[in-house]
Amino acid sequence: MSSKKYELDAAAFEDKPESHSDAEMTPQKPQRRQSVLSKAVSEHDERATGPATDLLPPSKGLTTEEAEELLKKYGRNELPEKKTPSWLIYVRGLWGPMPAALWIAIIIEFALENWPDGAILFAIQIANATIGWYETIKAGDAVAALKNSLKPTATVYRDSKWQQIDAAVLVPGDLVKLASGSAVPADCSINEGVIDVDEAALTGESLPVTMGPEHMPKMGSNVVRGEVEGTVQYTGSLTFFGKTAALLQSVESDLGNIHVILRRVMLALCAISFILCMCCFIYLLARFYETFRHALQFAVVVLVVSIPIALEIVVTTTLAVGSKHLSKHKIIVTKLSAIEMMSGVNMLCSDKTGTLTLNKMEIQEQCFTFEEGNDLKSTLVLAALAAKWREPPRDALDTMVLGAADLDECDNYQQLNFVPFDPTTKRTAATLVDRRSGEKFDVTKGAPHVILQMVYNQDEINDEVVDIIDSLAARGVRCLSVAKTDQQGRWHMAGILTFLDPPRPDTKDTIRRSKEYGVDVKMITGDHLLIAKEMCRMLDLDPNILTADKLPQIKDANDLPEDLGEKYGDMMLSVGGFAQVFPEHKFMIVETLRQRGYTCAMTGDGVNDAPALKRADVGIAVHGATDAARAAADMVLTEPGLSVVVEAMLVSREVFQRMLSFLTYRISATLQLVCFFFIACFSLTPKAYGSVDPNFQFFHLPVLMFMLITLLNDGCLMTIGYDHVIPSERPQKWNLPVVFVSASILAAVACGSSLMLLWIGLEGYSSQYYENSWFHRLGLAQLPQGKLVTMMYLKISISDFLTLFSSRTGGHFFFYVPPSPILFCGAIISLLVSTMAASFWHKSRPDNVLTEGLAWGQTNAEKLLPLWVWIYCIVWWFVQDVVKVLAHICMDAVDLFGCVSDASGSGPIKPYSDDMKVNGFEPVKKPAEKSTEKALNLSVSSGPHKALEGLREDTHVLNESTSPVNAFSPKVKK
């Protein structure tokens, strides 16, 4: 039958191999090597438990004025964060490869006394820096606003009243309330009373620690039981979080990968443009005997227009828009460049508890009974009777049982006596009387092997119970036995309940989707090996699991070998996850996978996860993570579960597609422009077609037209961050050779069509060739010089915008994905402005280049010249798109530059075996430990409790010390 499942925080059940807390350590446990984190904790604990004179006396509360004075003295209660001044952001926008080229052009124009052109270039420089500064500030404000939603609060006694305030403004001497369910907002001393504190996020200890006035709860821990008043002793960098700063500094902050890519693209385009423009400059001096001034002016203007001035601005805007989109999916981005890295993730190292699982223990449907009339419902009622069912639960086990049992049925009984859980007996017991029949009986619930020793028919059911225990243990499922006395006072086994922290309903499907999207998932947990194996089986992950003793032992996290990936990569790739790991193992696992060639994402929630989060390409702090984990992470989840991470990947891939289409377009536009003027300078010169104008011996545009093209294009490109795209089905990585090839194909068609129109225009302009020109065949009058210049301006401008629509769909036709309304409207507006400017341009001579509007004319045919240019551009746009698709088909067929290869680690993966040695490496054995294998080989004939005794001293077996839950953990025989 189905029963109500109760959800319980699984942190209390998760088994981790180590404790650094203030609680008493189990004496049998061998002392493990001390990590960097352990040293930080020890140093902090020494200070916290030092002489009483080092600590403030119990506080009775502060006034607002006192708190403000102390805040000025001690600073805010938060991790220090470096912020770039606003003015420095603006100054940076005025310097760099792109701005430097523009400054050179401005200086040259002013040196040549071209004041209007120099002023235009200077205005563009200032406008570019201002827009870049504004977009950067806006993106930073968006991230800061999202971060503010993560700020913790604290209940503090100020001005003679309790109030809720931002934990960041706490100061030493504040009186705070530490209550069940709340986070400890700072390092506090307890004034009076005791509380149970969960320090798992700080120390790895899975069991709550009981703390009194002699202890100091640390910021980042959580109160799980009780309520006390405490005095704030340390805040900000003086807390344990400050003590872990040295560990986090072992990972240097890498420059975002996207900035490296942008620099490469900018330098490549600048180099190409500079070389071609210098060739034009030299040729003009030699061929046309142009003055140094005119030749230099032409070369500089073409160079300035060809370089992508707004490249970083558009990318920053696109990433900022992506971060807002991610926030709608419950993902807060703390570093914009992480979005680009997330799109290339092909390896996800995920926590088990809370991410893959519900982080809630549940009673399962499977229930084993030994007498007729007993079932899951009746067994749950008996288990609830062995507790105070109408009082707040005393422990995690009672909480789980009472949440699943029918408490109304329990009210039919009166509890005469109750014995709470005792770590020695490992069970609870109660004496009850049935209000309906008056029958008096005892009930008990506890560890299966303990209850088995109590029942009167142990010999009859021993083998059956042992088989059940072994089968459940082999699957990593915990179990709880319930027994009841009969009228003779004999104990009868009522049933065996099973419980575990189940997977989230969507986890299995999410992992399947992840693999379909090219992302491998590795589970990392501090839990027992058997529990990890069972979870992998339930989630269709490889149940082959590595434990901590199989991993390489690294002494210093600051000095990791550079050959980890080569030596141990195959071993780690061949398994489905890692169990019984320590915090530094996570750090090493991530580094090994990165060295193996994978783009690795890591999820974590505690201070001890912070180094691994920092080391990963993308660190993800899961829902409920500590401030230290959030500070180290690139992304913070505000909703639990793995599905949120997959959504982050898909949204990031959408952002990547937008940046890819923009870079492809920007490279194409640059190549189209510079190659057009380069070829036109050498082969299609007005002089060769009879031009006698000394200022029109070679074809060029006035600076104003160049700048109009630049401003309209860059303005339209600001909307590309909102474009519609389809995310890739595989991880994305930058393949710049392929990007340049794709852009070159688009540029070649656009440039070729522009050169052809220039040739047609020059023939229509020339008195010598007009009779055989297309202008004559179409019934158009001979083309004036001014209209030839304006026509080519319109052609180049239209081709630029149409190329944008081709570049955004990759290897598909331009209509494969409709553009977003904002991008479409931006392009239409820019095209209308260009068309209107070209049609009604005032007849003038800017920069001594004659210009004239295309719509000015005597006949209707002449007035329709802009329409002919549009038709010409659209026809060639279709040709460009067909050529693009065919080129992509050919590139995919030959896998040009690995364009269809997966973004995965390199090299084959060898199957893993227990005795696997990689390059001579053999896992280091821990000394003086009783292995699980030895305990598992004990004979069951002496009873399951004998076999279980051998497991009690093993550090990797679930802790049996004091927890009423861990007493029912899986133990198996070989």
Curated annotation (Swiss-Prot):
The active site is at 351 (4-aspartylphosphate intermediate). Its EC number is 7.1.2.1. It comes from the Eukaryota. Residues 1-61, 952-974 are annotated as: Disordered. One of its GO terms (cellular component) is membrane. It is a multi-pass membrane protein. GO terms for biological process: proton export across plasma membrane. Its main location: membrane. It is an enzyme of class 7 (translocase). It catalyses: ATP + H2O + H(+)(in) = ADP + phosphate + 2 H(+)(out). GO terms for molecular function: ATP binding; ATP hydrolysis activity; P-type proton-exporting transporter activity. InterPro entries: ATPase_P-typ_cation-transptr_N, ATPase_P-typ_cyto_dom_N, ATPase_P-typ_P_site, ATPase_P-typ_TM_dom_sf, ATPase_P-typ_transduc_dom_A_sf, HAD-like_sf, HAD_sf, P-type_ATPase_IIIA. Belongs to the cation transport ATPase (P-type) (TC 3.A.3) family. Type IIIA subfamily. This is Probable proton ATPase 1B. The gene is H1B.
